[in-house]
Curated annotation (Swiss-Prot):
PANTHER family (alphabetical): PHOSPHO-2-DEHYDRO-3-DEOXYHEPTONATE ALDOLASE
Major place of residence: cytoplasm
Catalytic activity: D-arabinose 5-phosphate + phosphoenolpyruvate + H2O = 3-deoxy-alpha-D-manno-2-octulosonate-8-phosphate + phosphate
One GO BP annotation of this record: keto-3-deoxy-D-manno-octulosonic acid biosynthetic process
Protein location: Cytoplasm
Keywords: Cytoplasm, Lipopolysaccharide biosynthesis, Transferase
Enzyme Commission number(s): 2.5.1.55
Family matches, as NCBIfam families: KDO8P_synth, PRK05198.1
Molecular function (Gene Ontology), one example: 3-deoxy-8-phosphooctulonate synthase activity
Gene Ontology CC terms, in alphabetical order: cytoplasm
Source taxon at top rank: Bacteria
Protein name: 2-dehydro-3-deoxyphosphooctonate aldolase
Length: 276
């Protein structure tokens, strides 16, 4: 599949979707995107910047949700213009898709909305590539009908994303078998290495996280074989306005990516048919 001008798939190098969870300010987004571009250019990694203009599913009703669509799209447009990278953002049921699609390169559907048929069709009809996040409550094989709904719109640029499965209260686990199972959708598979270490609602009024396990799960996913890696990052996760506990520090992205790209090359060297 072609995405933002480059090919993605199990016969292609790992690509990266990364950025702060939520748009906090113009300068933070530009600085973060600039640093990520510097790192990915150095390592030869295809890169898409991500950040959200509205986090509609915060644990607390008083938590920071973002600047809103109008201001958020201005920021994403500036990142795209000044840094020269494609941009991704997530959308919601109330989002005017055409307006967002006129600014960003890739649309993303929140995991909690994966079963909303009309929503999936609406997003996939906007004429942009779509990254569909698998719900924490959904079996990997249940992504097949979701993809069928998506592709029924005529959009063939669909990716599926694993972000962990609910395991009791306030906890997620990553079943690495799901990455292989979701290949049966015929779509590129992306692994979300940071939301997978989230502890949803684990701090009472906010979610916790175990960012120390990001490299563990990222390495495991790359070893299984994935097309892309999704990772939220922040210059200072302790001060992030959303999902700080599971965000990977920006100054550690290069070291993590360097390891993952080496592992990706080894994993994909001989293909995957022998494991089918």
């Amino acid at each position: 599949m072609k995405l933002c001008g480059f090919e993605v798939g199990l016969d292609q190098p790992l690509f990266l979707i990364a950025g702060p969870c939520v748009i906090e300010s113009m300068q933070l987004q530009l600085d973060t995107a600039g640093k990520l571009k510097e790192v990915t250019d150095k390592l030869g990694v295809n890169f898409i910047f991500k950040s959200s203009f509205d986090k509609a599913n915060r644990t607390s009703g008083t938590a920071f949700r973002g600047p809103g669509m109008e201001e958020g799209l201005k920021v994403l447009a500036e990142v795209r213009k000044q840094i020269g990278v494609p941009v991704l953002t997530d959308v919601h049921e109330y989002t005017p898709m055409d307006e967002v699609a006129s600014v960003v390169d890739v649309l993303q559907t929140p995991a909690f909305l994966v079963r909303q048929t009309d929503f999936i069709r609406k997003v996939c009809s906007a004429g942009k590539p779509v990254n569909i996040k698998k719900g924490q409550f959904l079996a990997p094989w249940d992504m097949k009908p979701v993809v069928e709904k998506a592709k029924a719109t005529g959009n063939e640029q669909i990716m599926v994303c694993e972000r962990g499965a609910s395991f009791g209260y306030n906890n997620l686990v990553s079943d690495m078998r799901s990455l292989a199972v979701m290949r049966d959708t015929g779509c590129p598979v992306v692994f979300d290495a940071t939301h997978s270490v989230q502890l949803p609602g684990g701090q009472g009024t906010s979610s916790g996280g175990q960012r120390e396990h990001v490299p563990v799960l990222a390495r495991a996913a790359v070893a299984v074989g994935i097309s892309g890696l999704f990772a939220e990052t922040h210059p200072d996760p302790s001060k992030a306005l959303s999902d700080g506990p599971n965000a990977w520090p920006l100054d550690q992205m290069e070291a993590l990516l360097e390891t993952l790209m080496e592992l990706d090359a080894v994993t994909k060297k001989h293909g995957f048919s022998r494991f089918a």
